[in-house]
């Protein structure tokens, strides 16, 4: 059942591009998410930033505290040859398609968990925010606009959870076990000037 539900999000071809923003597929995704997660849309406060960055807020018992779940719903272009449908196919018990790994699956998991908790009348101990960007793949401004809003409102987070790396075997020499790769910041870059002095 969850596989079929996730497929409704994968089928939306939300490809981010620097050249043009086409809302058609992003609108399909918004409609699919609203259909898949009705309690979230009934109970959360929802704000949109830039063209299509979403922020949901589920109020908690202690409104002075906040946590943030992050993701993004844009994908890179599905170029090249694919053995399965580029935007969604279930085959041999596996879900195939652009966005299954990066990263509609994690967004689906976050939204599903919250939907299930809301169905049990769960009230979080603190405010729960879910933010999803629409142009992360091209270093776009979507989530930055949401951050500006948080700063202006004085909203600070006790922690934020974003997409992570995979669980991989032996990531470097000398480590012979499976390791979960945990990133410590959002996609960005750092410029460092290094000067070496002999002696």
Feature map (PLM): residue ranges:
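Short Gly/Pro-enriched turn/cap motifs at secondary-structure boundaries
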Residues: 45-47, 181-186
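Acidic/histidine-rich catalytic neighborhood of metal-dependent amide-processing enzymes
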Residues: 101-181
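Acidic/His- and Gly-rich active-site-bordering loop/insert found
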Residues: 1-100, 117-124
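Short coil/turn connectors at secondary-structure junctions
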Residues: 62-67, 91-92, 124-128, 153-158, ...
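Short beta-strand segments
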Residues: 70-72, 132, 161-163, 194-196
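Short strand-loop junctions, especially beta-strand C-caps/beta-turns
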Residues: 13-15, 133-135, 196-198
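Polar, glycine-rich mid-to-C-terminal structural blocks
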Residues: 179, 191-199
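Active-site-adjacent bridging/hinge elements
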Residues: 85-87, 190-193
């Amino acid at each position: 059942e969850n596989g079929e539900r996730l497929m409704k999000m994968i089928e939306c071809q939300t490809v981010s591009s620097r050249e043009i923003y086409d809302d058609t597929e992003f609108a399909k995704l918004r409609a699919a998410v609203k259909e898949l997660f009705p309690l979230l849309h009934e109970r959360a406060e929802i704000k949109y930033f830039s063209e299509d960055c979403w922020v949901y807020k589920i109020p908690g018992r202690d409104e002075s505290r906040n946590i943030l779940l992050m993701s993004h719903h844009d994908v890179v272009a599905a170029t090249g040859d694919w053995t399965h449908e580029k935007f969604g196919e279930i085959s041999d018990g596996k879900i195939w398609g652009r966005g299954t790994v990066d990263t509609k699956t994690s967004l689906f998991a976050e939204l599903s968990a919250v939907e299930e908790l809301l169905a049990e009348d769960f009230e979080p101990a603190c405010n729960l925010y879910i933010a999803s960007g629409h142009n992360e793949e091209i270093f776009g401004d979507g989530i930055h606009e949401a951050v500006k809003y948080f700063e202006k409102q004085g909203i600070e987070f006790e922690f934020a959870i974003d997409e992570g790396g995979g669980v991989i075997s032996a990531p470097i020499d000398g480590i012979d076990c499976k390791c979960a790769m945990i990133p410590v910041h959002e996609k960005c870059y750092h410029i460092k000037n290094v000067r070496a002095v002999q002696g």
